[in-house]
Amino acid sequence: MVHFTAEEKAAIASLWGQVNVEETGGEALGRLLVVYPWTQRFFDTFGNLSSASAIMGNPRVKAHGKKVLTSFGDAVKNLDNLKGTFAKLSELHCDKLHVDPENFRLLGNVLVIVLANHFGKEFTPQVQAAWQKMVTGVANALAYKYH
């Protein structure tokens, strides 16, 4: 279980309140697919993923990115129970989708980069540390079923 301090919870919640879920989610998933092209195999029904511009402009990538980032909203609300919050998604990704759990860590790291880009100076080292802790906790919760 990950323990978050009151300061970390406040930093996460404060930034989350300013996140444009649709824009940020689409960008994070798009960047994942561009930077780590082997992750594209899980999205073979998404149509054209042949180039960075095709991926970043793909409406299915944007829609799924929004869906993924929306689930991070559940994490923000349930920081003290990430494993329970993501139990069903862990089962889905393990048993049905067969997603390599390393991809959860990669997506979390990409999300932190996107947030840093969007929020600039507001994304202080303390805020980054809190978010990195959260995305690592989410990745571990999603990977739980694999163990």
Curated annotation (Swiss-Prot):
- Domain Globin span(s) in chain numbering: 3-147
Distribution of this protein across tissues and organs: Red blood cells.
Pfam families, sorted: Globin (PF00042)
* PROSITE patterns referenced in this protein's UniProt entry, alphabetically: GLOBIN (PS01033)
GO cellular component term of the entry, any: haptoglobin-hemoglobin complex
Q: Name one GO biological process term.
A: hydrogen peroxide catabolic process
Output the InterPro entries linked to this UniProt entry: Globin, Globin-like_sf, Globin/Proto, Hemoglobin_b, Hemoglobin_oxygen_transport
Residues engaged in binding heme b: H64, H93
Record flagged with keyword Iron? yes
The record's listing under SUPFAM superfamilies reads: Globin-like (SSF46458)
Keywords in alphabetical order: Heme, Iron, Metal-binding, Oxygen transport, Transport
Any one Gene Ontology MF annotation carried by this entry is: heme binding
Metal-binding: present as a keyword of the record? yes
The annotated subunit structure for this chain is:
Heterotetramer of two alpha chains and two gamma chains in fetal hemoglobin (Hb F).
Q: What does this protein do?
A: Gamma chains make up the fetal hemoglobin F, in combination with alpha chains.
- Please state which protein family the record places this protein in: Belongs to the globin family.
Name of the protein in its database record: Hemoglobin subunit gamma
What species is this protein from?
Answer: Loxodonta africana (African elephant)
